[in-house]
Amino acid sequence: MDTVLAVFAHPDDAELTCFGTLGLLKSRGYRVLVGIITDGLAGLDPARATDRVLEAQLASAVMGFELLRGALPDGDLQYSSQLIVPIEKWIRDYQPAIVITHDYDPAGIDHQDHIAVARAVLNVAHRKPGIELLLQVEPSRGSRSFEPNVFVEVGAFAANKLAAIACHKSQAHKDYLQPGYISLRSDWWAAVSGTSSPLAADGKIHVEAFRIARSLIFGSSALTFTKRPDRVEESSANLLRLPHPRPRTVA
């Protein structure tokens, strides 16, 4: 069984940005691992220290994913061997074919922990030949520097994604975890990508956006990439169609 590993700084990062895509991959036979580097406790009442761990466990359970936990301090991640080592261990131990992580934004627009994790994952992943697809997600609050070049329609998994996000009750006050905000993001990427075939029970189009950091042709891909007509480059022997660095749709 092929494995997909999602590596993120905090509990709720993956839920917000790629749980629909992870659900799609699981439905097509992938083992899905969600790795959280920090304890996520910054700004949280110490008396509720166990809440974030439990919330992450519940969220992954909603989707049937396996949860991996790191123990580095929330809010103080630095690009260093201390961060690289646990990520390298996960990749060595689980040998993922697909890795998903934060977008690396050198301008520092995103959360500093996200930037550090993204840089560390890129460092490790580009040294591991077994990783055939490396995707970076949209920053939680959006960023003008984020230019996705692939989109995934995740309507079939939208309800479970929202249920997983709702597990993070300690973070319920944050605007970017509100259903309306999540829907607005999805609507925007649906418009940008030209997606027009709703798959969700609510009749809406639900889209997640990614930037491809690494892509190799491989026959076992669970994602079929459909590009705009003027940018198509297909491999007839593979489900994965390699995209050029320009927006297109994943069906």
Could you say what each language-model-derived stretch is?
Residues 90-133:
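Active-site adenylate/phosphate-handling loop in enzymes that bind or generate adenylated species
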Residues 2, 131-133, 137-251:
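The feature marks non-catalytic terminal segments
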Residues 14, 40-44, 75, 104-110, ...:
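Active-site environment of divalent metal-dependent phosphoester hydrolases
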Residues 52, 83, 113-121, 157, ...:
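Internal, well-ordered alpha-helical segments in soluble enzyme and binding-protein domains
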Residues 1-97, 126-127, 217-250:
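Active-site rim/loop-helix segments in enzyme catalytic domains that contact anionic ligands
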Residues 45-47, 79-81, 110-112, 146-149:
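Short, well-ordered secondary-structure micro-motifs
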